[in-house]
Amino acid sequence: MTTNSGITKEWVDETVKPGDDFFRHVNGKWLATHEIPADRPKDGGLYTLRDNAEKHVRELVEKIAKEQPESRIGALYNSFMDVEKIEADGLEPLLKEIAPILNSATPSHLAVTLALLSRAGLPQLFAWYTSNDPKDPKNYTFFLYQSGLGLPDESYYREEKHEAACAAYVEHIARMFELTGLAEGFGLTPEQAAQLVFTHESELARLHWNVVENRDAEATYNPYQATELDEKFPGFPFSQWLLALGADPETLGQVIVAQPSFFEGAAKLFTSIPLMSWKLWAVWTVLRSRAPFMYDELVQESFNFYGKTLSGTQQIRERWKRGVGAVEKALGEEIGQEYVAVHFPPSHKEKMLVLVGNLLEAYRESIESLDWMTEATRQKALEKLSKFVTKIGYPDKWRDFSALELVPGDLFENLRRTGAFDADWLIARKGQPVDKSEWLMTPQTVNAYYMPPANEIVFPAAILQPPYFNPDADDAANYGNIGMIIGHEIGHGFDDQGSRYDGDGKLESWWTEEDYAKFKERTSALVEQYNAYVPVGLAPKFHVNGELTLGENIGDLAGMSIALKAYRLALKKQGIESLADAPVIDGMTGIQRFFFSNARGWCTKSRPQHAEVMISVDPHSPDEFRVNGVVRNIDEFYEAFGVSEGDALYLAPEERVRIW
């Protein structure tokens, strides 16, 4: 048995009681002294691993770019890094891209142009993708989703707390039109053009569903035949748009429209708003999307708004970092194949499989002992749990990029080609059987996910590193950290939305009405708790949205509770009968190390501007509440740190939420 605790206590702030603020007790000294690097809005936690992964990917990319400049990776990276050519090209690449917009003489012509721009990887009025059909999860289907905004979310256009951001956005649009001279072609000053674009986007924002509505798996599943979209949503030529996209509506068949009222309203606006306004807005969408890839003056202005104003970031990322990011976005699996060959030992996968096995066993035991669930629902829950698919490290089959040809020295052409390649790949999958080997993240991504229609949990190689996963450390540290993350992802299968899918990934209820009512009662209590939380340093109006974050909060609470049970199981398999008998290491009991390790994993610090954006749009709670909001609902936390009535985190036993 190891005596390596896997944790250190140098950041502990002894002036903060664990029962008042466990997050700051564990991390207080770091939070008080750490300076966020100038080129990012947030630091700590996962960012250390992301820095490591980025450094490793850079080494691979630059080696390939130097030795094989004609390769896809070499062509894309070198074209991004060729600053001299980009500066010399000036506005010319953008003018070529917007020429079809300016030449669109009719709404139908413009609709075709918007589709072609979408094929080039540019966001437009409607977003689209193909993925597992929630009602037929063995096959891919085609989804249509609301889009068209330049601010993070529709709430920015209507809520008073975002007025300053809106004013800055209008100024930014005007500045971009001033730098490019593009407003003149419309007979407008930059200021007039900016106001017209903002008014246009505000009209679209009024039609958008909000972030809570968009979480509803049933409400956003609305099937239509592709051939009937013109009739169902009159005003926009969907058939022509789909054809230009590369998807023939006659063969496309059924499509899923996520927000029908948005599509109905946007289609009406397409004919009621003057064509000139639509063309100006379309020019703006291309300009804001391509600006980060253009000459320095536009790059800096884009960063000044999206980086500095919205996120508080003080300095743009070094060019190599942005270049690596561009390669990752376009060719993630191709570089991922190189990454895992060097940076993922097979032993990590073996250890992870043991952890996952214990987490699944702990979930099974927990479900079997739930006192609020009837036997009928319990059996369905256990059936779903038994069908979970676990993917660790990297895909068994890699995506084939051989049909993609990129051009050395032409960044914009490479961006268009990668966009079209992705579009064709996605469209070709419609109606085909789901490729069960597919991953939605690359191996070098520091993250993890659960996919409801596949009922699978996925852990890329890059997250399987200290402090989250340390194969040489004591079990308490690993179960408190990566164990909780595993439990969190499994927990998504049983959160307020994931619980609507059965074991085969089908969006179909398996609950009795009585049990679902009891489940809702417990989750509603969690919503109330989180609605009351305001991150330190923000005004009360920036409180957590308990409805938006509910799924992640259920995942956090379930993940922590079940990881603790799994730690108990691991101890028993080593002949240790109880948590109390776990070894004391570095002056801490096993249960203390478990909670301590978890709090260290969430140790992050955000700039206020970034925190304000994320509180509005991110379905995850701020990291301080991913610690404090969870532990106060777990009885063992009270025992481990002597938390009692009067402490800030104290909840009476009957107020503690217990779900899974």
Set out the residue ranges of the language-model regions.
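Noncatalytic, helix-rich "gating/capping" subdomain that lines the substrate-entry/channel surface
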Residues: 61-354, 358
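Short, Gly/Pro- and small/polar-rich lid/capping loops
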Residues: 1-10
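Hydrophobic/aromatic-rich, well-ordered segments within soluble, folded domains that form packed cores
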Residues: 11-32, 157-178, 550, 557-562
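Intrinsically disordered, low-complexity linker/terminal regions across diverse proteins
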Residues: 197, 203, 256, 260, ...
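Short, solvent-exposed loop/turn and secondary-structure capping segments
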Residues: 33-37, 128-129, 153-155, 208-210, ...
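Extracellular/periplasmic catalytic domains that process cell-envelope and extracellular macromolecules
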Residues: 14-18, 134-136, 450-453, 587-589
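Active-site-surrounding "flap" and adjacent substrate/cofactor-binding loops of secreted or lumenal enzymes
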Residues: 3-4, 16-20, 25-88
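Short secondary-structure subsegments characteristic of cysteine-rich extracellular domains
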Residues: 38-61, 187-207, 478-484, 586-587, ...
